[in-house]
């Protein structure tokens, strides 16, 4: 099983980059210390997504960072990514594991305790859980699950849980106190005019996680 060796999990959305090149924004975040990126550009055609994934792979390699691909196991394999991130109702993690093997990471998005338990049973390496706080990017998932549900989930499962949704500096300590291994976020870095400095500020509040732990 691959090791979850990061505490800040950056998820991309080029539509929130304010017209800037996504690779340039992510490069800034990597320069600021981000060590895991999920490429999540669901509206791109497969060929365009593959080209972007390969470019993102070269970029993350420069910084010794991990790259996960949202949903697309085929793109992850073709781009040489470190794994995939699956939706709660998408491909079962067990099926993805058969295709990817034991050496790649599998994350699963969960929006409730039942989904979290199912992800563990399917062999996920980690989950994102949320939205914990209000956020426009996750409005489709309804009302925030709240900090109490996050705390209950971290007590019930044995894999790392990343708090997702409305994450900012002010609420990171609360999420960590609830048992989160780290935080996952999009706009806090992608939409920031200085992704490097924003990444540094966020990482200063998070526990270090290394591959040598």
Swiss-Prot record:
Q: Which domain of life is it from?
A: Bacteria
Q: What biological processes does GO assign it?
A: thiamine biosynthetic process; thiamine diphosphate biosynthetic process
Q: In which pathway does it act?
A: Cofactor biosynthesis; thiamine diphosphate biosynthesis; thiamine phosphate from 4-amino-2-methyl-5-diphosphomethylpyrimidine and 4-methyl-5-(2-phosphoethyl)-thiazole: step 1/1
- Report the catalytic activity: 2-[(2R,5Z)-2-carboxy-4-methylthiazol-5(2H)-ylidene]ethyl phosphate + 4-amino-2-methyl-5-(diphosphooxymethyl)pyrimidine + 2 H(+) = thiamine phosphate + CO2 + diphosphate; 2-(2-carboxy-4-methylthiazol-5-yl)ethyl phosphate + 4-amino-2-methyl-5-(diphosphooxymethyl)pyrimidine + 2 H(+) = thiamine phosphate + CO2 + diphosphate; 4-methyl-5-(2-phosphooxyethyl)-thiazole + 4-amino-2-methyl-5-(diphosphooxymethyl)pyrimidine + H(+) = thiamine phosphate + diphosphate
The alphabetical list of record keywords is: Magnesium, Metal-binding, Thiamine biosynthesis, Transferase
Give the E.C. number(s).
Answer: 2.5.1.3
Q: Which residues bind 2-[(2R,5Z)-2-carboxy-4-methylthiazol-5(2H)-ylidene]ethyl phosphate?
A: 135-137, 166, 186-187
Under what name is this protein listed? Putative thiamine-phosphate synthase
Residues binding Mg(2+): 71
Q: Which Gene3D superfamilies match?
A: Aldolase class I
Has keyword Magnesium? yes
Identify its protein family. Belongs to the thiamine-phosphate synthase family.
Its ancestry begins with: Bacteria, Pseudomonadati, Thermodesulfobacteriota, Desulfuromonadia, Geobacterales
Which Pfam families does the record associate with it? TMP-TENI (PF02581)
